[in-house]
Amino acid sequence: MALQIAQNNRDGQQLVGADQGKVEVYVLFANTTYRTLDLYWVCERERENMYLTLKPFEEVRVNTFTTHSWLFRDYYTGERMHVRSQRIFQPIRVRVPKSQQSPDQLVDVRSEVLIHFPMRSLRENCLWLVARWLIRTSNAPRRIIHGYHIPSTLKQQLLSLLTCIESYSRVAGTRRRR
């Protein structure tokens, strides 16, 4: 992505209504996965605030603050996606010289933030695959898991993933309806 001067560039003037000490940051979130993602921002109170849902390979321009952390979850399972191999993205202000003739004058630019799939072990990949398949194809996935002839540790991990996916579906569903 070529450098893009931020549209809301106010030449360093404070954003109207912004708290003192907050620095505005301009980002372009790009979903590089084949999954639909929920974007959340988190401020001082550590509460996840649903921002929007991003389809596969979709982008969105966001004006945020350095004090807002961002996280990204799979729309259906709640699995966390990553930015630069990290689960949480902390915005950083990017400024460049306005021109070569006046290198002292800096302007804000919008930085591209690539959201990607997390690195997982083969075991984790298989567990997620089985859990997602069971939720899509079965009315009683827990009963099926208990019937599998696999080690109890794998059963517990599958049950834990099912619980995680189901609880995320409930919580995210109420956030999306607001």
Swiss-Prot record:
Part of a complex with Cul2, Roc1a/Rbx1 and the elongin BC complex. Interacts with sima/Hif1a. Interacts with itself. Interacts with mgr and betaTub56D/tubulin beta-1 chain. Interacts with tubulin alpha-beta heterodimers by itself or in complex with mgr. Interacts with microtubules (MTs). Belongs to the VHL family. InterPro entries: VHL_beta_dom (IPR024053), VHL_beta_dom_sf (IPR037140), VHL_sf (IPR036208), VHL_tumour_suppress_b/a_dom (IPR022772). GO terms for biological process: cell differentiation; centrosome cycle; epithelial cell migration, open tracheal system; establishment or maintenance of polarity of follicular epithelium; lumen formation, open tracheal system; mitotic spindle assembly; negative regulation of microtubule depolymerization; open tracheal system development. Pathway: Protein modification; protein ubiquitination. This is Protein Vhl. The gene is Vhl. It comes from Drosophila melanogaster. The keyword Calcium does not apply. Disulfide bonds: none annotated. One of its GO terms (cellular component) is nucleus. It comes from the Eukaryota. Involved in development of tracheal vasculature. Probably involved in halting cell migration at the end of vascular tube outgrowth. Possesses E3 ubiquitin ligase activity when in complex with Elongin BC complex, Cul2 and Rox1a/Rbx1, and can target sima/Hif1a for ubiquitination. May play a critical role in promoting microtubule stabilization when tubulins are correctly folded by the prefoldin complex. If tubulin is incorrectly folded, may promote its degradation. Pfam families: VHL. Keywords: Angiogenesis, Developmental protein, Differentiation, Ubl conjugation pathway.
